[in-house]
Amino acid sequence: MKVGVIGAGNWGKNLVKNFLELGVLSGVADPVEANRQAARDMAPSAEIFSSGRDLIAGDCNAIAIATPVPTHFELVAAGLRAGKDIFVEKPMTLTSGEAEELVNLAETHERILMVGHLLLFQPPIQFIKRFLGEGKLGKLYHLHQERKKLGRARYIENVTWSLGVHDIAVLLYLVGSQPRRVFASGHCGLQEKVEDDVYVHMEFLDGIKAHLHNSWLWPTNRRQLTIIGEKGMLVYDEIAATVTWHRKRINDELESIDEGSEVVFEGSGPPLRIELEHFIDCIKTRKAPISDGRNGLAVVTVLERIMMF
């Protein structure tokens, strides 16, 4: 198997490193000479290109794309038409129309299309997915996701596009469906038309609600997911890497029941390595990735709906 990487900058260099360590890196493309030189130093045996199109025209089986989002559509489409399996970093595209076109293209050419929703591959998130599937919380009521800290502010994309993409992917994955209604409210404090602080509310057909708060203008670093169900509650502290099961509920007589709490999962593996190993496995087995093109389309669709507010 041969995997080429297009984009070897800030994040792309991590893809280069991991594919190299996995023994499948064949080439790297980047328009910036400093990034190309860094790739040469890291992977002397890899072919180095200044153009992603040249890498696509080569003999690699698959391509990983870590370039600015506006370039995703053209590069992914070119790769699929060339018969390559594709891994593309989040968000998949700028619009749901572009994302849907890529999904159809991948299906037409029978290619793997995977989107880099990294948090889905955190071991705690995989544990929570199994935990919910076993029905231990009973009927789900609502989910609360927080991702906020001081910085890193951006000039163009708002905090939801920067930080919230991860959380939207997780919420959709855990609920297992697309929201029927989306509401959002944000505040532009540092600059006009770029929200620093955003609240998102989603309603699903089965009555589940999800609430998301993203901010890069916040005094403390907080990354926490809370899930409320009829039989209890889960809290995932991403910083501490713990999942705590609170056996707390309110019964039919509106009495508060507290049967204690326990840490049911602790620790985390390297999600990027797990994610890329999953991509390689999907190429070999031809199974659909956890974060396939339709998953990427669902996330972009929610992002579009948020931007309407």
Question: Over which residues does each language-model region extend?
Answer:
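Mid-domain beta-loop-alpha active-site segment that forms a flexible
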Residues: G116-P123, K149-R181, N295-G296
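N-terminal Rossmann-like dinucleotide-binding module
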Residues: M1-A43
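Active-site loop of classical SDR/Rossmann-like NAD(P)-dependent oxidoreductases
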Residues: N14, N35, V263-E277, S291
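A contiguous active-site-proximal alpha/beta segment in oxidoreductase catalytic domains
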Residues: T93-G151
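Contiguous beta-strand/loop segments that form the cofactor/metal-binding neighborhood of enzyme cores
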Residues: V165-T242, E266, L272-R286
